[in-house]
């Protein structure tokens, strides 16, 4: 019985003794056993594992980038050099590219509320001309940013002025433009140079930013002079007294159709009557095509809204000027020009910018307000050639 018991105990103990190594070897084979029990193909499992790994790495990278961005954003207000006009420079139109400038710090003290202007003056005694070099301006007074441009004139030359290009989104424009004015030596002591800084507005009145009035009699013009000048408060301009004209331009290169829409005028002299607008095309300094609007009576702000279409091939655009003139009857019965606007390749300032915008945005109407200029000034800039007489056949 003891033997039977021993045999039974041995028989019972053998399975226990053999089960221990089975459990020891089951650990390393656990993953292969699980893989074999899954009813999917192995390539699907490998793809799932790879996708999970890629997702995990992507989540880690996103967390790291978010932490770095927050840390950089916290440090940015402490660094003054990060202030810039990147978004404003991206809004530049056509060919106007504004150089990088770092002059947006507030003016020190209260003595410079209107900003400063760097100006160069040179007088040529041979040609009796004074050359005015507009270099740059800084710390202009405006809310946020502005689209400044400069307007230059001399008191002894009525109606003659020069306008620079418009510089977008900056308070420190770099002009780098030169203009000349005919001033005899005898008139230098009583001549005054006037430079106006204005903020360009396409559909409203241009906001003055500052003004410089420099008596030329107080300046030593024996040598080239270049220095900074303090801008003062702006005053009334001569063009504001003439009035303004709003019109749109549209050009289609494929058909050569130039559409001019005369919209309205404002600020005309109250003593004028029956105002209308003449539209004239000049080719190679000779009068080419023309048309005019209907007359508007009894108002200083006439509304026209009349369109005119001209056929102008692309090859003739560089030789063509567009002149819009406001005419009205004054004290005399005959109508006379009140003011004109010159557009085309020989224009300057806002009219040149309007012309460039029309060419840059073909098939799209571009509307804008323009200050009227003196008719004599525009005629002098055109330098029209006399018309050639028509040769009639002999009878």
Curated annotation (Swiss-Prot):
Extracellular face of the membrane: 1-44
GO cellular component: acrosomal vesicle; axon; cytoplasm; dense core granule; exocytic vesicle; plasma membrane; synaptic vesicle membrane; vesicle
Compartments, as annotated in UniProt: Cell membrane; Cytoplasmic vesicle, Secretory vesicle, Acrosome
Residues in compartment: Cytoplasmic: 66-395
Pfam families: C2
Keyword Repeat: yes
Keywords, alphabetical: Cell membrane, Cytoplasmic vesicle, Membrane, Repeat, Signal-anchor, Transmembrane, Transmembrane helix
Domain notes: The first C2 domain/C2A does not mediate Ca(2+)-dependent phospholipid binding.
Function: Involved in the trafficking and exocytosis of secretory vesicles in non-neuronal tissues. Mediates Ca(2+)-regulation of exocytosis acrosomal reaction in sperm. May mediate Ca(2+)-regulation of exocytosis in insulin secreted cells.
Family designation: Belongs to the synaptotagmin family.
PANTHER family: SYNAPTOTAGMIN, SYNAPTOTAGMIN-8
Quaternary organization: Homodimer or homooligomer. Homodimerization and homooligomerization do not depend on Ca(2+). Interacts with SYNCRIP isoform 2 C-terminus. Binds inositol 1,3,4,5-tetrakisphosphate (IP4). Binds to AP2 in a Ca(2+)-independent manner. Interacts with STX1A, STX1B and STX2; the interaction is Ca(2+)-dependent.
Protein name per Swiss-Prot or TrEMBL: Synaptotagmin-8
The organism of origin for this protein: Rattus norvegicus
Organism phylogeny: Eukaryota, Metazoa, Chordata, Craniata, Vertebrata
């Amino acid at each position: 019985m003891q033997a039977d018991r021993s045999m039974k105990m041995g028989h019972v103990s053998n399975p226990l003794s053999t089960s221990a190594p089975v459990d020891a070897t089951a650990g390393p084979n656990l993953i292969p056993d699980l893989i074999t029990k899954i009813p999917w193909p192995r390539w699907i499992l490998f793809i799932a594992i790879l996708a999970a790994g890629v997702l995990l790495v992507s989540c880690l990278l996103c967390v790291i980038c978010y932490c770095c961005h927050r840390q950089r954003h916290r440090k940015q207000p402490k660094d003054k050099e990060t202030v810039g006009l990147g978004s404003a420079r991206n809004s530049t139109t056509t060919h106007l590219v504004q150089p990088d400038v770092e002059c947006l710090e507030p003016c020190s003290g209260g003595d410079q509320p209107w900003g400063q202007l760097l100006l160069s003056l040179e007088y040529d005694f041979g040609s009796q001309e004074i050359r005015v070099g507009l270099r740059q301006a800084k710390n202009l007074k405006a809310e946020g940013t502005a689209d400044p441009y400069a307007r230059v004139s001399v008191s002894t030359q009525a109606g003659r002025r020069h306008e620079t290009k418009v510089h977008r989104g900056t308070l420190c424009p770099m002009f780098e433009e030169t203009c000349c004015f005919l001033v005899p030596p005898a008139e230098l002591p009583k001549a005054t140079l006037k430079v106006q800084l204005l903020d360009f507005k396409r559909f409203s009145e241009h906001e003055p930013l500052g003004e410089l009035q420099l008596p030329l009699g107080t300046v030593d013009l024996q040598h080239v002079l270049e220095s900074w000048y303090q801008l003062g408060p702006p005053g009334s301009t001569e063009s504001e007294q003439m009035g303004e004209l709003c019109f749109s331009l549209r050009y289609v290169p494929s058909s050569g159709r130039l559409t001019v829409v005369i919209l309205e005028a404002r600020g005309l002299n109250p003593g004028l009557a029956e105002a209308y607008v003449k539209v004239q095309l000049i080719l190679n300094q000779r009068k080419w095509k023309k048309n005019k609007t209907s007359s508007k009576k009894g108002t200083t702000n006439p509304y026209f809204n009349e369109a005119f279409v001209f056929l102008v091939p692309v090859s003739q655009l560089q030789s063509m000027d567009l002149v819009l003139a406001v005419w009205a009857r004054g004290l005399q019965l005959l109508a006379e020009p009140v003011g004109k606007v010159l557009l085309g390749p020989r224009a300057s300032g806002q009219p040149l910018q309007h012309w460039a915008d029309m060419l840059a945005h073909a098939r799209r109407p571009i509307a804008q307000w323009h200050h009227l200029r003196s008719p004599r000034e525009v005629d002098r800039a055109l330098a029209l050639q006399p018309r050639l007489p028509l040769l009639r056949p002999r009878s």
